[in-house]
UniProtKB/Swiss-Prot annotation:
Lineage of producing organism: Bacteria, Bacillati, Bacillota, Clostridia, Eubacteriales
Subunit structure: Part of the 50S ribosomal subunit. Contacts protein L29, and trigger factor when it is bound to the ribosome.
Gene3D superfamilies: 3.30.70.330
Superkingdom of this protein's organism: Bacteria
GO BP annotations listed: translation
TM spans (from-to): none
Protein name, as recorded: Large ribosomal subunit protein uL23
GO CC terms: ribonucleoprotein complex; ribosome
Protein family (similarity comment): Belongs to the universal ribosomal protein uL23 family.
Length: 95
């Protein structure tokens, strides 16, 4: 079993994710190999909250160029976490 801190990579701070905070939903970039159960357990253990549901989406990397060299941004996985009423993640307070 992997460490919980290896599953949750970083929070997503965008206008859309900040609007979801009103609905008690939090957005994170997570490990591509993680499933919903692992993500739920990681959030509950790291932030000590109760998770109601987890929605995930795979995001393909955009193609990029550096002069004549072509490449692409890495693929990633995003998770939208819905918490049970009365629970909040303090990391997002004041944003």
């Amino acid at each position: 079993m992997r460490d919980y801190r290896d599953i949750i990579i970083k929070p997503v701070v965008t206008e859309k994710s900040m609007n979801l905070l009103a609905d008690n939903k939090y957005t994170f970039i997570v490990d591509k190999r993680a499933n919903k159960t692992e993500i739920k357990n990681a959030i509950e253990n790291i932030f000590e909250v109760r998770v109601a549901s987890v929605n995930t989406m795979n995001i393909k990397g955009k193609p990029k160029r550096m002069g004549r060299f072509e490449g692409k941004k890495p693929d990633r996985k995003k998770a939208v976490i819905s918490l049970k009423p009365g629970h909040k993640i303090r990391l997002f307070e004041g944003m």
